[in-house]
């Protein structure tokens, strides 16, 4: 059922998040005849400066989420940090439930890196060796298992190089585990020739479309340049797209999925998943 609340008969999409991605989404929404309603932390946030209907609130507050979602045709996000249990409650509301894209059953795999790794391994997707790090003993054992090639990650909340550490010694790893007040995981550090991104879009009916695979030039963990199409062999590009499509299907992702990849010697490994507009996709606006 489509619930149109806009006075001009336009469908309304509630966007949780007020950053650059939400701002760019607003530009595309105008061309599609969709009205954006924004949940923003401040009225001078990037997206709040260009969206007409702005509701100030906190994305971790269930009542603020309900307020921005009320009467909308769909709810989506420009980041993955909304509490998953709140997203589920929006879907399960006994009165006027709201479609949420992506659904919480998929979103969890973009929110929690350890759950993501476990699920991708179940699917047979190429991922680095990894382990939960819940104690010094876990850290010690993982260091030895990967010959000291350790990337330590916060399982939640990290992005753009934040929440990632590369300890130079076992003692540094043990100190980090003791100091950091966050759930952690370890991954084998992967040498790579380039970073790639395979972006796809999937609708509720399961139809999927893929964009060309992009090479991402990073600086300090932040994408500075996206080269599309990536200068890689056609067979490798096809492998990247097919992997992204399979992950979207298996996780039942709706909306946009970006699969960040490391490539070395023609072999790929999944780095991260993002279920939202992605920095490597800005070029699609042009």
Please place each PLM-identified region on the residue numbering.
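Short catalytic-loop micro-motif centered on adjacent basic/acidic residues
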Residues: 76-77, 102, 128-129, 185-187
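Short acidic-hydrophobic, aromatic-tinged amphipathic segments that line or gate anion-handling sites
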Residues: 54-59, 131-135, 166-169
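ATP-binding N-terminal substructure of ATP-dependent carboxylate-amine bond-forming enzymes
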Residues: 1-111, 137
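A conserved helix-loop-beta module that forms one wall/lid of the active-site cleft
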Residues: 95-98, 102-164
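Short glycine-rich anion-binding loops that position phosphate/pyrophosphate groups of nucleotides
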Residues: 21, 80-82, 155-157, 201, ...
């Amino acid at each position: 059922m489509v619930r149109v609340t806009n006075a001009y008969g336009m469908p309304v999409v509630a966007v949780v998040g007020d950053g650059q991605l939400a701002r760019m989404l607003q530009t595309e929404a105008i061309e599609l005849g969709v009205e954006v309603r924004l949940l923003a932390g401040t009225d001078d946030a990037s997206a709040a400066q260009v969206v007409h209907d702005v509701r100030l609130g906190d994305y971790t507050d269930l009542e603020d989420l309900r307020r921005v979602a009320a009467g909308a045709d769909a709810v989506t996000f420009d980041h993955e940090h909304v509490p998953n249990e709140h997203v589920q409650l929006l879907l399960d509301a006994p009165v006027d439930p709201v479609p949420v894209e992506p659904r919480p059953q998929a979103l969890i795999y973009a929110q929690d890196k350890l759950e993501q790794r476990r699920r991708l391994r179940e699917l047979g997707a190429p991922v680095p060796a990894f382990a939960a790090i819940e104690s010094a003993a876990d850290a010690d054992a993982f260091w030895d298992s990967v010959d000291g090639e350790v990337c330590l990650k916060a399982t939640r909340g990290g992005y753009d190089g934040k929440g990632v550490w590369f300890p130079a010694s076992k003692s540094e790893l043990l100190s980090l585990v003791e100091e950091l007040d966050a759930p952690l995981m370890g991954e084998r550090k992967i040498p790579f020739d380039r970073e790639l991104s395979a972006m796809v879009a999937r609708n509720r009916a399961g139809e999927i479309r893929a964009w060309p695979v992009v090479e991402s030039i990073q600086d300090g963990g932040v994408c500075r340049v996206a080269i599309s199409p990536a200068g890689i062999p056609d067979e490798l590009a096809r492998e990247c797209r097919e992997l992204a499509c399979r992950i979207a299907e298996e996780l039942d992702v709706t909306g946009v999925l970006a699969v960040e990849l490391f490539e070395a010697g023609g072999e790929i490994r999944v780095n991260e998943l993002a279920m939202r507009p992605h920095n490597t996709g800005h070029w699609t606006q042009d």
